[in-house]
Regions:
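Catalytic center-proximal scaffold of phosphoryl-transfer enzymes
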Residues: 1-61, 104-512
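An N-terminal low-complexity regulatory-tail signal and nearby short nucleic-acid-interaction modules
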Residues: 62-126
Length: 512
């Protein structure tokens, strides 16, 4: 029985020569005519893309249609028949679009296609978009709005994937992030710092209006404030770092340094192998899954991987959110975990107290803040609390001012056991959570909260997952892992594909 499938095109290696000659001629002409370098660069790039499209088309032609005979026996013993009609598919590469015709194998037309030799040999992706184009497109999408990506790719490659395609691509890519993360080996012990630092914080992400809600309801300010148009993502980070011993005076000097003063030039330890993760609450089997539980579950796993001998102090540095501290107490090791209140969440409250007590007297207020912060750094939190209460009584604060001061003192009192800053500084521990603050801003806000952006839980979680692989420095490894897993899933008979020989060896040669 004759093959009904036809090759992609009847091209041969020699057909690349005219394009190569055109490129050479263009460069020579540009040199003779004194063409500006940037104009020549654009002309060369245009011809390189043409050459790439032609070369990739040649690859498809040399592979042929994937016709390996009327009947193929699969490794499981099943015999499949070549179907009468060839089947088309689209392959959108960085060089442009291809429409491919392939021989396919199965039991009969209309039934499931079991084996496609052409796809198997070339390990094509499930979607129309090449793995390389997916890589490049998503590397743009994780940093800029989806609508900007087609513009960027169009300017560079003359390829314009739709926004819907990019969103689906991101959702599909995100499916592999969790298994990839779990497969990563722990850093080598000699590459780690002596301290294991853990931190978490929340950041709101704007959600799309529910489908059942009328557009006018979005203008109901009271209802909007009750339903909360944002969902809170809980961001977590783990890293190791070496100690940096400091005195309270050194810290307070850095906090009150004039903007014109240069910071101390001494080298500071650098966080090692910083890992970020973020989770949103979602429903699973009809039950609400907590974002805090998800994030702290991962933090606990990461700490166990990074501190397997439990020989590093685990420093949990956060703000005063009660639910986060409770999660840390539940999920992190009971032994060796030290809770530290981020100093920079205490200092604003000292400022608030100064304003309550001294009003607009900035000089006196600054003096009070300096004194109280220094005393906090010396471990005198109880004395600071007592002093603030005493001053509130002396100044006869009433009403809202009295209540506000009580809140400030209550916050400090509730976190006093996390404010032994004199001990932390002497041990070289960090006392501020700048890493997680920066993560919430860069990881979440810079991508998820741009003007007009609205997300679903699914789309937001997918973006956070894929974005985390880049921020963790794992992008290339993730892409390789994903392609390998997709190949295993899509092509269980790939060993057969590696032995396909639809052309004579002489035809496959690229020699002239």
């Amino acid at each position: 029985m004759e093959s009904m499938a036809k090759p992609f095109t009847d091209c041969n290696p020699n057909e690349l020569e005219p394009t190569l000659n055109d490129l050479k001629a263009y460069v020579e002409q540009a040199a003779r005519q004194g063409v500006a370098a940037h104009e020549a660069e654009a002309g060369i790039w245009h011809r390189v893309l043409q050459l790439g499209h032609q070369a990739l088309g040649l690859l498809f032609s040399l592979v042929g249609s994937g016709d390996v005979g009327e009947i193929v026996e699969l490794p499981n013993g099943q015999n499949v028949r070549r179907l009468e009609m060839s089947h088309p598919r689209v392959y959108q590469s960085v060089f442009g679009r291809f429409e491919l015709e392939r021989a396919v194998y199965g039991s009969r037309e209309g039934q499931k296609i079991v084996y496609v030799p052409f796809d198997t040999q070339l390990r094509l992706p499930e979607s129309d978009f090449s793995y390389l184009l997916q890589d490049w497109a998503q590397s743009f999408a994780i940093d800029q709005a989806y609508r900007r990506v087609p513009e960027t790719l169009g300017r560079i490659l003359d390829v314009h994937p739709s926004v819907d395609s990019l969103e689906r691509m991101n959702l599909k890519m995100a499916e592999t992030v969790r298994p990839f993360r779990e497969s990563r080996p722990a850093p080598e012990p000699e590459d780690e710092g002596a301290l294991c630092v853990v931190s978490a914080d929340g950041k709101g992400i704007p959600m799309r209006r529910p489908a059942a809600e009328m557009p006018i309801q979005a203008h109901d300010r009271e209802a909007a404030s009750k339903t909360n148009r944002k969902k809170m993502a809980v961001v977590g980070t783990v890293y190791t770092i070496d100690p940096l011993v400091r005195t309270p005076e050194e810290v307070v000097a850095s906090l009150f340094r004039s903007p014109d003063d240069h910071p101390p030039s001494a080298e500071r330890p650098v966080p090692q192998h910083k890992r970020l993760w973020a989770s949103l609450p979602h429903e699973q089997d009809g039950l609400e899954v907590s974002a805090i539980e998800q994030t702290f579950g991962w933090l606990a796993q990461e700490v166990a991987r990074r501190n397997p001998e439990a020989d590093k102090p685990i420093l949990l540095v956060m703000d005063g959110q009660k639910s986060l501290w409770e999660a840390g107490q539940r999920d992190l090791p009971k032994e060796g975990t030290i809770e530290i209140l981020d100093l920079l969440h205490a200092t604003p409250r000292i400022w608030d107290a100064a304003h309550l007590l001294y009003g607009r007297d900035e000089e006196q207020g600054l003096h009070v803040v300096y004194d109280r912060v220094l005393r906090l750094l010396k471990g005198e939190v109880r004395s600071v609390i007592a002093g603030l209460r005493q001053m509130g009584t002396k100044r006869a604060l009433r009403g809202k001012k009295r209540d506000k001061l009580a809140q400030i003192c209550g916050y400090l009192e509730n976190n006093a056991h996390r404010m032994h800053y004199d001990v932390y500084l002497a041990a070289g521990y960090p006392i501020a959570s700048g890493v997680i603050e920066g993560a919430c801003r860069h990881f979440v806000k810079d991508r998820m909260e741009r003007s007009g952006m609205r997300w679903t839980i699914e789309s937001a979680q997918a973006m956070l997952d894929v974005r985390s692989t880049s921020l963790n420095g794992d992008w290339d490894d993730f892409m390789r892992y994903r392609i390998e897993k997709e190949t295993q899933r899509l092509y269980p008979y790939r060993a057969l594909g590696e032995s396909i020989d639809t052309l004579e060896e002489s035809e496959l040669s690229l020699a002239a």
